[in-house]
Structure formats: C-alpha cells, structure tokens
Regions:
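Metal-dependent amide/peptide-bond hydrolase catalytic core
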Residues: 53-58, 65, 71-246
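Acidic/histidine-rich catalytic neighborhood of metal-dependent amide-processing enzymes
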Residues: 1-66
Length: 246
C-alpha cells in the first residue's frame, strides 16, 4: 500500500486493511461486525480483495470469484423407548433416522453450473445415546452439511429438507426437531475491468494465468459481498486445518 501511494501521488481514494482473528466457526466478532458498522456509516466500498489461501499448489494458480453456500442441519427424531423383544410396543428412532439420511443423501439437487460444482450433502454425525443392547432408544439424532450453488438459497434448501422430514415422520408416527445454521449464501462476483486487472497482475507477477474458481469452503467474502464486489487471492492452502499449518 505504501509503495502504491508513493507511486501514485494523485490518488484521491482510501485503502483499508481489515485483519481479523475471528474467521472460523460462527465468525460473529470479526468481519461481520465491521461490515455491519460500514453499512450503518453508509460507507461506499468499490472493491474488496480477500487474502484467503486460494492456491492449491503454486502461487498464482487460482482466484476465487464466488463461493458455495453452507447450511448445517441437526435432526432429532423422537420415537418410543421399549424392549427389543417387543418392537410393536416401541417406535425405533434409529430406523427412522436411517430412512431420513438415506433419502437426504440421495437427493439430486442439481448438476452444477458453469461456475459451480453440483450441490452436495454430507452426513457428519449420527448419535444414539443408548448403552443397553436390548433396549430400543427413544431419541436418535444426526447432523449434515450441504454446500450449495447459486441455483439455491438456504431457504429453498430448508423447504426441501422439511418436506422429506415431514413425510417420513408422518409415515412412521414419530416426531422430529431440526435446527439449521446457515454459514453463508452462495454468491458469484461478476467479471469486470477490476477483476480482469487483478487477474492480469497475478499473471504478471507469478507468470501463471490464474483459474477462476468457486471451489472450497466458505470465507469472509460471504460478509463482504453484501457491501462490495470481491475476489479472493492468497497463499497456497495445502496444509489448511492440518498439524503444522503453514
């Protein structure tokens, strides 16, 4: 920034650097709060460049031009506890949650788009708190995460999931609870002179023409895209979330 300002004495704008230590997990006390503050102040931001580790193997390989949305759901099925020798006197939530997870996993959300991978659901937890081998449990729970492209919103995904849950639980005469957490909606930054300029600068410095991509997880661009067009470019991310991350 200092070099740029020294070389461009007539520059009449402002350049701000935002450094946050709250980017993972719920990420409520970092970029999100700054974005809310800037909205209240009615600050106009022309462009944001997020320093996310976007490159798979070499610096210059990839620029992120958008991100998939992320929705996590925790399902709880309430059946009826009973003895395994008398299943007609119980209602096994384990069996019901297996039916639900099987149907959820087999949803064909879409085939992907020009810029996005197909929407994907992964089951991340299955919990049945039961220490007895001969007892049908009362409750079974599971957690899943969906990474969705811009053909969907978190709202449309929830509707689809809720319809399946209602159908299967009605059939099995069981009750269910579901809690959702949305980490971000899918977004795509339109290509313009600024995005082309950044791509050309990366090529000039690294001698590699970067691929434009929307792969990977969520980043703080999910907040910044609400106030400004943004791209992501940074270091190589081969060791992200691993021991000795570098």
């Amino acid at each position: 920034v200092s070099i740029f300002l020294n070389n461009n004495k007539s520059f009449n704008g402002s350049i701000s650097l935002l450094i946050t230590g709250d980017e993972e997990g719920d990420a409520i006390n970092g970029t999100k709060k700054v974005v809310d503050y800037l909205k209240k102040k009615k600050e106009k931001i022309n462009f944001c460049l997020v320093g996310e580790p976007t490159n798979p193997n070499k610096l210059g390989e990839m620029i992120k031009i958008g991100r998939r949305g992320s929705l996590t759901g925790k399902i709880e099925i309430i059946g009826m506890q009973g003895h395994v020798a008398y299943p007609h006197r119980a209602n096994n939530p384990s069996t019901i949650i297996i039916q639900i997870l099987n149907e959820l996993k087999n949803i064909k959300f879409d085939k992907g788009t020009k810029n996005f991978q197909p929407t994907n659901l992964e089951i991340t937890k299955i919990n049945i708190d039961n220490n007895a081998d001969n007892v049908i449990p009362r409750v079974a729970s599971a957690t899943f995460n969906i990474r969705f492209n811009n053909k969907h919103s978190s709202g449309s995904i929830k509707k689809k999931i809720n319809k399946i849950l209602s159908k299967i639980n009605k059939k099995n005469k069981s009750k269910f609870k579901i809690d959702y957490r949305v980490s971000g909606e899918a977004f795509l930054t339109k290509q313009n002179t600024t995005t082309n300029m950044i791509r050309n600068v990366v090529k000039k410095i690294t001698k590699i023409r970067p691929k434009l991509s929307t792969t990977g997880g969520t980043s703080d661009a999910r907040f910044l895209k609400n106030i400004s067009p943004c791209l992501e470019f940074g270091l190589v991310g081969k060791t992200m979330h691993k021991i000795d991350e570098a």
